[in-house]
Amino acid sequence: MDNLLVRGLTHKLYDKRKATAYELERVVKGYLENDETEKIRAVISQLANDFVYSPARGPNATFGGLIGLAAVAIALGPKIDSYMESILLPVLYCFNDSDSKIRYYACESMYNIGKVAKGEVFRYFNLIFDVLCKLFADTEITVKNGAELLDRLIKDIVMQQAATYMSSAEDIKNFKEGPVSSSIQDVPVMSTEQPRMHTFSLSELVPLLSERLYVINPNTRMFLVSWIRLLDSIPDLEFISYLPFLLDGLMNYLSDPNESIRIVTSNCLYDFLREIQKIAKVKYHILQRDEESEPDFFDSMVRRNMSDAELKEISDYVESSLRDGSFILEAHIQIDYKRILEIIIDHLGSSVPLIQEKALKWLFEFIYIAPKDVLLQIPKVLENLLPLMSNDENMRQSAKDLSQNLVILVSKIMDIEFSGSETNNKDNSLSVDFRSLIEVLQKLLSNDNEETRLCALEWVLLLQRRTGGKLINMHDPIFQTLLLQLSDPSDLVVSRTLELLAHIAISHKSVNLVPFLKSLLQMFAEDRKFLNSRGNLIIRQLCNYIEGERVYTSFAGILETEENLELASIMVEVLNNNLFTAPELYDLRKKLKQSAPKLQNIFTTLYTAWCHNSIAVFSLCLLSQNYEHAANLLSVFAEIEFNIDMLIQLDKLVQLIESPVFTYMRLQLLEPEKYPYLHKALYGILMLLPQSSAFRTLRDRLQCSSTPRTNTILANERLPRSRRDDPYWTDLLERLKAVQLSHQNNYREPIRATRLALAGALPSTPTATTISTTTSASGITTTASNSRDSFITRLPPTAALSTGARKKPKQ
């Protein structure tokens, strides 16, 4: 350039620089007409090196260089492709300048270059796009305005030419984009993208776009979302194939504090989902119309989520395209559903409600779009899904609906797997990782939220049922976790846990039932509060899920040989109370009342265990209408020491006699000639009771049924003794005596040990005898010395009373 042009371009006035640029444009056009390419390159080089890159020059020189480069580009017109690199790079360099005016003029220059170059900008698209990202975050309003203008131009070029433009330039084959790099590795070039040389390439843009998505600036975020929506709106680009690289960043935008960003991102994700659904529906329709291919269960899932109107719309679209010979783009697009699902599942565990809501929606739809991929991800899905049960009502309901749909899907695949039917022949690799699934559900059983624990139990129960009880046994870690769940504060959780444990216990020909009940008994032994708070509920629910007779006879077999006599007595008391009151045990009570020989084994089995609790045995005899044996038990009662617990049990028995369960027995009191031993047994209980409310209740009942005729029968007629010497009943009575003797010895052992310990501590030759005077609760004054005989006063009150009761009182 001559000195006149140089001075004009570096002038401080914009109008002077603009006029000089017009002159420069005229000069370059002359060079172009004369094919003087070297002079053109010299002008471009001078503008770049002497005006833009030179640090000695002031800002006016840079302004002149930028407007000069734009003038050269305009002069070159369609032939700019050979000079594109040398013109564009100096302009891009200016976008990093600290002077906002230079950045603005760079926008203006790039705009003019873009208007001329059009599709040629695709060769440097990543560089331009990266610059635009930074410009939208610029704090200077004029720069942002210039960036928006440039952005609109580039978008127009992309819309018009991105899918079709092919560059004719040959001088940049070895050009490498240095300033911009990406940390995203191994981005594949989709097979559906036609090879384009030096033109718009998604495989080069997407890594940069994916990386920039993690910026914080709201303006840049809006810019990025707008570009994503634009690229997706160009059908031939098949942009949807690259969604896995962008989805994570987009989902994060749903937590942006700026509402407008959340809205535009939500709409963008909605469009992506609709597009994926359409692709799946088109592929299903094409597969369905193919006579050689028959859609299987999974292929047909997409149809289940289509209305008749949608089905007709898709059918019309496919059929019309085939008639016209049009290319059906949706049929050829490949989408990585697995990677999309992984991202969605990760975001399901987000703490942001909008992200959770969007993830739920996508997962719900993917059950129909890609059921096989969902099945393979089931453990991770449930790990993040079930904790959502603790959220608000709407979120909880959405999570429940999704869980229910997953239940249907898993149930179907389990039916297929365990029946060995059609679908497995098509895809032998399809299988649910049950072990991983059980491990996840085991962790969820410890979740703080009740709904989550319940849902986890429902899932385990489903899996156990669908596998025919083969999935879980007593040796699996989850079994111990389930036992611990029995102490859950929620009755619903306990009930569901018992249903599952019952299913495990009765599977494999019930070989697990007795070990399970032993484990349960061990828990009761270790935690008495657990027995008191949950014992009745557990027993009743077990009898609801397993036949009551099996539960009780199995418990009886265990308790018969139980070495912990105190535990055995308490457990028999709990079992006995439920036997009389639980609706779940109605059938067992009915069987015990019958006198059929084949049902006698039930009574015998229970009796041998019930011997650990004498009052329970007596109750069992009344329930089974073995009144003679009940009357004979009174002789055993006379030999054992009654304590406060036994008196409380007698009080409860009287209450039971007044309850509906003993209606039949109360009516039998009206037939003393037929049931004489019933009167004797009840009168015996009356004599054992202290004069309390229970005593008066039973006395009144007996008086109501007592008539002169009854008294005559009981006084004068000899009671039948046909069964007294029967070996069967004799053995049962002896069994009771032996067990009760063991209990008495077990009760006295601590007292005896204390006596011996204290006796050993006394001096062998006492030096003095201390006499103490005490007053008993009855007001009787007694004296006791410090000799061994005085330890009788340290026995429990009931023991002392029973000892004295057997002594003949002085006259």
Swiss-Prot record:
GO terms for biological process: phosphatidylinositol biosynthetic process. Keywords: Cytoplasm, Membrane, Repeat, Vacuole. Residues 775-785 have a biased composition (Low complexity). Its main location: cytoplasm. HEAT repeats lie at residues 81-119, 122-160, 240-278, 334-372, 375-412, 431-469, 472-510. The keyword Acetylation does not apply. It is a peripheral membrane protein. The keyword Cell membrane does not apply. Coiled coil: none annotated. Pfam families: Vac14_Fab1_bd, Vac14_Fig4_bd. Residues 775-811 are annotated as: Disordered. It is found in: Cytoplasm; Vacuole membrane. InterPro entries: ARM-like, ARM-type_fold, Vac14, VAC14_Fig4p-bd. It comes from the Eukaryota. Component of the PI(3,5)P2 regulatory complex, composed of ATG18, FIG4, FAB1, VAC14 and VAC7. VAC14 nucleates the assembly of the complex and serves as a scaffold. Belongs to the VAC14 family. This is Protein VAC14 homolog.
